[in-house]
Amino acid sequence: MSKKVEVNKVVVAYSGGLDTSVIIPWLKENYNCEVIAFVADVGQGEEELEGIEAKAIASGATECYIADLKEEMVSEYIFPTLKTGALYEGKYLLGTSMARPIIAKAQVEVARNVGADALCHGCTGKGNDQIRFEGAFAALAPDLHVIAPWREWDLVSREECLDYLAERNIPCTASLTKIYSRDANAWHISTEGGVLEETWNAPNDDCWAWTVDPEQAPNESETISLKVEKGAVVAVDGKAMTPYEVVVYLNEKGAKHGVGRIDIVENRLVGMKSRGCYETPGGTIINEALRAVEQLVLDKTSFEFREELGIKASHLVYDGRWFTPLCKSILAASEELAKDVNGEVVIKLYKGHATVIQKRSDNSLYSEEFATFGADEVYDQSHAEGFIRLYSLSSRIRALNSK
């Protein structure tokens, strides 16, 4: 966006960190506008939110709005995505990606309520988040201007940002050296930068902020029981819980046993690769439980279709296309497939592993009588011969024609 565009009031997504603390006075100086700070509570922790309203006002914001989005994020974004089976590039449970659309949506709502004519985010010009935020803004508020300071200003280092605030007597507790970049919410914590920028470097202890080192995890395993209804976990160990409560409870259990760590090199939407250490303890447990019930309930073609939906959904969510017709259609299809995904799963947690050891469902298509290797009254093994001849007919014809 050009600086020449006239802006009267802007709502900035504010985290309380160095970047967004600089953005507030920078917006006032460069756009001569009123700045409203918006803080999304997505479960990043009380420490991150403590005193954040006062900090925003001290940086120059007129007001600061804090929205508690934790329950909605899990129930309306994370759990529906889980039903698709989405795993970006086969590993990533999309912790950062799923949080962005709800943050953007809530930011737009604040902008509407205060009569703002612009939105602002603190994402860099190299990452995926700028696309996720601005893609959501385009879908939800195409009439509002969007300001992305990192694509406009001349500040290039943390030292310059700290000097910028010091020159204006704006308090900031950030340090000069920031080794790692972290993003946290109720679903996951990601860590990037530092030693991880060289792929031959093994992650050190500082690369993990949440989970116990699996080697240091308890020597005794722990089992938990999860009740699944319509593709969502509704109770753990016999206790009914809301989606957010499920995640919080399983996060504690999983982190204690070192569950949910991945070290991944992923393909960013902007074209480059990035490496990160991601921790999703509760999410890993939930995902294992849902897939276990699906194995019992979904027939072969439905299972294959769900797998296809999961791959496509992972890219749509990662690429910031949550508010598109295609994403909505995939979520709706997954919801339909999940209607019979009901059951109970027992998972063993032990030194970094979440292993399904028991599973059952009233809707199970598994039949011990059919599956047994012994004699049964239902399946005549001689019937397989005709099926195989028809199934392999095209291969047989191709071979005969090639002679």
UniProtKB/Swiss-Prot annotation:
Binding-site residues for L-aspartate, renumbered to this chain: 124, 128-129
Pathway as given in its UniProt record: Amino-acid biosynthesis; L-arginine biosynthesis; L-arginine from L-ornithine and carbamoyl phosphate: step 2/3
MF annotations from Gene Ontology: argininosuccinate synthase activity; ATP binding
Superkingdom of origin: Bacteria
Enzyme Commission numbers on file: 6.3.4.5
GO biological process, one term: argininosuccinate metabolic process
Localization, UniProt: Cytoplasm
Entry binding sites for ATP: 13-21, 40, 122
Protein known as: Argininosuccinate synthase
Annotated catalysed reactions: L-citrulline + L-aspartate + ATP = 2-(N(omega)-L-arginino)succinate + AMP + diphosphate + H(+)
Family membership: Belongs to the argininosuccinate synthase family. Type 1 subfamily.
UniProt xrefs under CDD domains: ASS
Alphabetical list of InterPro entries matching this protein: Arginosuc_syn_C, Arginosuc_syn_N, Arginosuc_synth, Arginosuc_synth_CS, Arginosuc_synth_type_1_subfam, AS_cat/multimer_dom_body, Rossmann-like_a/b/a_fold
Residues binding L-citrulline: 92, 97, 128, 132, 181, 190, 266, 278
HAMAP family: Arg_succ_synth_type1
Key words, A-Z: Amino-acid biosynthesis, Arginine biosynthesis, ATP-binding, Cytoplasm, Ligase, Nucleotide-binding
Self-association state and partner proteins as the record states: Homotetramer.
SUPFAM superfamilies: Adenine nucleotide alpha hydrolases-like, Argininosuccinate synthetase, C-terminal domain
Any one Gene Ontology cellular component term annotated for this protein: cytoplasm
